[in-house]
């Protein structure tokens, strides 16, 4: 993406962030496969993975992880993708992030604390 101007790059990232929120796995994967950094983030540090996880898109989360997304990158509020998924009740996303080795003790709150708070500790058992 280095051939793009800063404004063009910002626009591509904004589109990709919307694709992550919407769970448009195919199109988002195409963006990443053509050079968009897999850990691209918005101004608040919410990565593509964070937004896909928060909005319950397990397939999109899996596709991003398969392309090298870091499951432990936290946003500017120190929130992790797995804690966000627990907060939103996205059980399948939690399972995908656990399989990817997401750190259950990172962030504020930690995934363990979020699971306890929202009665979802069974998702972290084992």
PLM regions and their residue ranges:
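N-terminal segments that cap or nucleate solenoid repeat domains
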Residues: 2-44
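Conserved ankyrin/ankyrin-like repeat signature
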Residues: 27, 59-60, 92-93, 120-123
């Amino acid at each position: 993406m280095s051939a793009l101007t800063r404004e063009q790059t910002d626009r591509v990232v904004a589109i990709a962030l919307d694709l992550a929120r919407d769970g448009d796995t195919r199109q988002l994967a195409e963006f990443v496969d053509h050079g968009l950094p897999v850990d691209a983030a918005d101004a608040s540090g919410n990565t593509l993975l964070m937004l896909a996880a928060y909005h319950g898109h397990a397939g999109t989360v899996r596709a991003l992880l398969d392309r090298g997304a870091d499951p432990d990158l936290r946003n500017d509020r120190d929130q992790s993708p797995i804690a966000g998924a627990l907060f939103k009740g996205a059980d399948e996303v939690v399972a995908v992030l656990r399989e990817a080795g997401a750190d259950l003790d990172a962030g504020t709150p930690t995934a363990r604390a979020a699971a306890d708070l929202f009665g979802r500790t069974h998702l972290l058992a084992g």
